[in-house]
Amino acid sequence: NTMSNLSGFVKRIRDIMRNDAGINGDAQRIEQMAWMLFLKVYDAKEQDWDMNEDNYESIIPEECRWCNWAVDDRSGKAMTGDKLLDFVNNTLFPTLKKLPVDASTPIKKAIVQTTFADANNYMKDGVLLRQVINVIDELDLSDYEESHAFGDIYESILKELQSAGSAGEFYTPRAVTDFMAQMIQPKIGETMADFACGTGGFITSWLKVLQKQVQSTADAKKYGESVYGIEKKQFPYMLCITNLLLHGLDIPRVFHDNTLLKDVLDYTEDDQFD
């Protein structure tokens, strides 16, 4: 049963990470999980784009794509130990942080660089790192039921942030955001913006209400374009992007930027939301 396997997911990772001297406390554990989950979820998206787009090209160099370094096909070829640690610290991270991104880069490609800009690998033990990667790679995100169920697990990971102290400020309880979305009753075609969106709670509650209204390809396109967010802190930004990819948004229009810095005079008609 999908759910019972998944409910043990967070605990299995926590138990492995507990043995790694580099992980200090819950916030770091969640941050460590976050970049791996992002790459796993992004890889599932890329498999989709590969199938559905002509000549899809990944922004990630081949050796750094999750499917090429993280997946362990049990042939004995998968990196582990010091070799894995060296690859993650000295190839993967520097490469993703320096991906060439400019104003013309499509959002769905640019998010890899913006997500990794301040990410860290805290783990110091390559064997434990391999174990965690294998647990994460067991997720079958191509399976609708499983990826849907994983959305709930992801929610529980975000909820843990509340008790992890420092990062709790980014998390608004789901009961609150769901209630607000139901009161607003958004309709397909309406847009919303959250200018301090944290891990994406309001946005995903809004999408939950809209998803039930999607009847056609045109609706699906409007659904995908119905939200906009800004988060100035790196860690919740990464969590938010992953959250939106899990909610079926191929182009998460959430930007890592400080809304408060943008002078009110800079806003144009186009920048207005419902």
Task: Enumerate the language-model features and the residues they cover.
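Non-catalytic, mostly N-terminal accessory regions of nucleic-acid modification and defense proteins
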Residues: 1-183, 187-188, 253-264
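Conserved S-adenosyl-L-methionine
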Residues: 166-272
